[in-house]
């Protein structure tokens, strides 16, 4: 039998990201676990509360993996600042990027669908490695995915999410601007 934390982490990330990237008009698949259902619910609330901000990334045409890596570097930088809120904020952002295929032109649908599927698996792998590597001790100390479920039983005040979201988005914009300037030089 494998490592339960690794198994649950991979299953949760795969469930959530493929759920977000499903084709338009596709029925919503059932969540694969309690934590998957809760993650979908919490990220949906965050995306709705900050719809204008998240929608600005909905049609992102750049490299999704690079952008997620930058955002993960900002939000999951070290164990001292890592928390469930930062993780959920990152996953809400990832979910928004994965939803962007809904605006793709018909004649390029298949190519873009393949790129989206590739990005899904690369992003699952990136986040899985971060969570089960760098942040494994934090996850274990906070009860793993059972701790995640316990934490989100009682919702946090909107001010917490607003501050976290603003800091995350500003960091991402700053990182993207520096990356863009660096590429142009």
Curated annotation (Swiss-Prot):
Disulfide bonds: none annotated. It is found in: Mitochondrion; Nucleus membrane; Endoplasmic reticulum; Cytoplasm, Cytoskeleton, Spindle. GO terms for biological process: apoptotic process; extrinsic apoptotic signaling pathway in absence of ligand; intrinsic apoptotic signaling pathway; intrinsic apoptotic signaling pathway in response to DNA damage; microtubule organizing center organization; negative regulation of apoptotic process; negative regulation of extrinsic apoptotic signaling pathway in absence of ligand; negative regulation of intrinsic apoptotic signaling pathway. Keywords: Apoptosis, Cytoplasm, Cytoskeleton, Endoplasmic reticulum, Membrane, Mitochondrion, Nucleus, Transmembrane, Transmembrane helix, Ubl conjugation. It comes from the Eukaryota. Expressed in oligodendroglial lineage cells. GO terms for molecular function: calcium ion binding; caspase binding; channel activity; identical protein binding. One of its GO terms (cellular component) is membrane. A motif (BH1) lies at residues 76-95. Monoubiquitinated by UBQLN1; results in stabilization of BCL2L10 protein abundance and in relocalization from mitochondria to cytoplasm. Promotes cell survival by suppressing apoptosis induced by BAX but not BAK. Increases binding of AHCYL1/IRBIT to ITPR1. Reduces ITPR1-mediated calcium release from the endoplasmic reticulum cooperatively with AHCYL1/IRBIT under normal cellular conditions. Under apoptotic stress conditions, dissociates from ITPR1 and is displaced from mitochondria-associated endoplasmic reticulum membranes, leading to increased Ca(2+) transfer to mitochondria which promotes apoptosis. Belongs to the Bcl-2 family. This is Bcl-2-like protein 10. It comes from Rattus norvegicus.
């Amino acid at each position: 039998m494998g490592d339960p934390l690794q198994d649950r982490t991979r299953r949760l990330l795969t469930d959530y990201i493929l759920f977000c990237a499903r084709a338009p008009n596709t029925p919503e698949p059932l969540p694969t676990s309690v934590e998957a259902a809760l993650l979908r619910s919490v990220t949906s609330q965050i995306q709705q509360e900050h719809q204008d901000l998240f929608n600005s990334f909905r049609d992102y045409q750049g490299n999704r993996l690079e952008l997620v890596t930058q955002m993960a570097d900002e939000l999951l930088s070290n164990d001292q600042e890592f928390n469930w809120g930062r993780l959920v904020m990152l996953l809400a952002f990832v979910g928004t990027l994965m939803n962007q295929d809904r605006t793709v032109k018909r004649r390029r649908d298949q190519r873009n669908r393949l790129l989206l599927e590739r990005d899904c698996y690369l992003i699952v792998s990136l986040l899985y490695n971060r969570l089960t590597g760098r942040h494994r001790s934090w996850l274990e100390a906070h009860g793993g995915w059972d701790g995640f479920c316990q934490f989100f039983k009682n919702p946090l005040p909107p001010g917490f999410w607003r501050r976290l979201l603003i800091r995350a988005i500003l960091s991402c914009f700053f990182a993207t601007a520096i990356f863009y300037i660096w590429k142009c030089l």
